[in-house]
Each structure stands twice: as C-alpha cells, then as structure tokens.
Amino acid sequence: MIIGIPKEIKNNENRVALTPAGAKELVKRGHTVYVQHTAGENSGFPDSAYETVGAKILPSINDVYQTAEMIVKVKEPIAVEYPLVRKGQLVFTYFHFASDEKLTLAMMDSGSVCLAYETVENPDGTLPLLIPMSEVAGRMSIQEGARFLEKPQGGKGILLGGVPGVKPARVLVLGGGIVGYNAALMAAGMGADASSCTSSLVSEKMSRCSCGTSSILTCLPCSWVGA
C-alpha cells in the first residue's frame, strides 16, 4: 500500500502521525511511505531520519494526498484539506465527527473511507488508540491548573507541592477514568494531596497508588456526582 504522511496544519498541532521507527516497519513489510517535507520536524524528526529508513519525501501536502492510497494523520483534516481527499482514499486519524458537522459532511461528499482512531475497539471494549490521548489530557490538566494557581496568572499564589512550612495544595479530581486517573497521578507526583471522586472501575487501581512520601491517591466512591 502507498501510505502518505502529511504535515499537520491545524493550529498548535506539532505532532506527526508516523515516526521514523514506524516508517521503517511499514517499509520492511513492503509498503511505500511518503512523508511531506518537514512533517516530523516539530516532533524532532528531520526528513533525513525518514529517508534513512526507506521513506520518500514529497515537497507539498498536495503531493502527499495525490500520491497516497492511505493518509495517516494525527488530527482531522481542516477545511483547506477537504478538497484534497479523494474518493476511495483511506484516511486514518482522530476525527471526532460528532462535534463537527461540516467535517462529517465533507468526508461523506469526498467518498473517502474514514477510519477514526477514537472508535477502534479491543474485544473487551477498551479504546487502545484513545487511551494515550486521554492520558496526555489528564496529565496536562494538572500542569495547566498549577500554572493558573500562580499570581501572575490571576491565581492565589498556591504552589501545588508546597514547601517546608507550607502545606501542599489539595486537589480533588472528579471522575476516575483514564483522564481522571492520570490527572490524580500527576497531581500526587507533583506533591499535592490528591483525591479522586469516582465510581469508575479504574478507581481500584487508584486506591492502590501512592506517589512520594505523603501524597496518596484516595478513592472516594461518589455515585451522587451527576452527569
């Protein structure tokens, strides 16, 4: 199969859909991999890293879409990419169609075959391609929260982990799924007193988790928390 990796052009998206290691595996299995010029640059992968493992570099996003049978991306195509998607072309990325009617209609009109990462399921119902995104979201939420506790950001000047003589902040995470678990784990790892309010089965793992010397993740079953 001819696989194309375009450069992500959605605002603030710096990731690339395929690493050189991934490209190497695909080439080894007989596929042809085309990567747009500088597609991996913002993730620390120069064009030369792809060329070394047998991938080929194309100069523009148009070239990638026109050449590839399957497009592999990180985020959904934005409006300027809609006309580039061809009938019968496979597009593999995070789509989140439910929140974007224009994208949904554009992909239907294109006649392409869309494979959404977030809907890929294991036999047990878990979502293996959504879990990494949820892990990142949970951990980033605590970093962002800690930043907005700072005085220059309009916060109260609270240091999440405290210092000798000053108690650490108390963090309550509502929900104990993948996002909530990683948020609580991150908060505890930064020295905060972290608790989770959840009825999720993931909470079993949380209740056994501790970070550092005093920050312990506590499971509080709270079925009364409404949706």
Give the positions of each predicted feature.
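Glycine/serine-rich phosphate-binding loop and adjoining beta1-alpha1 elements at the start
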Residues: 2, 8, 77-170
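An N-terminal-biased, well-structured beta-alpha scaffold segment characteristic
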Residues: 2-106
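Glycine-rich phosphate/diphosphate-binding loop of Rossmann-like nucleotide-binding domains
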Residues: 6-42, 152-207, 227
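Alpha-helical scaffold segments in soluble metabolic enzymes
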Residues: 25, 70, 103-106, 140-148, ...
